[in-house]
Amino acid sequence: NSGILSRQYKSLIVPICVNIMLAVSLNLVTGFLGELSLGHAGFMSIGAYTSALISINTSFLPPALSFFIAVVCGCILAAVFGFLIGVSVLRLRGDYLAIVTLAFGEIIKSVINYLNFTGGSKGLSKIPLYSDYNNFTVVFIIMVICIVLISNLINSRDGRAIKSIRDNDIAAESIGIKISKYKVSAFVIAAGFAGLAGSLYAHNVGIIKPNIFDYNKSIEILVFVVLGGMGNIPGSIISAIILTVLPEFLRGADNLRMLLYAIVLILMMIFNNSKFKANLSLNKTFRKLGKED
């Protein structure tokens, strides 16, 4: 039994890493840039299908090389679509941007659903497994690199420019910050990492279908970000881990599972909100002290 449980929870490591990458990358756009995007699952699906098709059709290459090419291509193509979306929605904000990105995700899903070479509604199967529960080291390393890169970006000069656009885009533009450049860059980076996460996901499960990447998946990723805290990378990581593992822990609870799940979500929201208020009060205190000085 202990062996079975060990295997069961080991199998969650790759999904946890994938969800962390999705949450952290979406936080770049939604939390730090301040733009509500509901099409993250669309970028994930582009990466997943691109890498899966390349892996299936390059089986004659060494497995490691085939996997590397597939993952890189999935990441790049998703980033290209991120650029196209970023340029297209430069003048949109708030609800309008959310609607357009949501429509993008659904259009991608519908296109994949009707193409023959993607397997249509049946999806793709027999995808080579390069990142199963016994071989999660590569996925974990990629996840760490993703977190480090985005964290360094946020703490850099470019990251401060992105946050200034969120706070006040008019003021940011007035001091010479190129808003269009940073908005598009944020979309490209977030989409690229989402495509990378999708590639790793495809090579972990071995079977992908269009309905996996519907708007529910985009909402799920957004929940990771909101519950963890907008503009809070450690919070996104913790939220992604808890919400990925929690359903497995509650699997044996039967009727109480949804109730317990809801209680945990509420507690996370309360904790996050109280932490936000505490930070806000500290900021006000420091501002008052600064004025007195």
Residue spans for each PLM region:
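Transmembrane alpha-helices and adjacent helix-loop boundaries
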Residues: 1-293
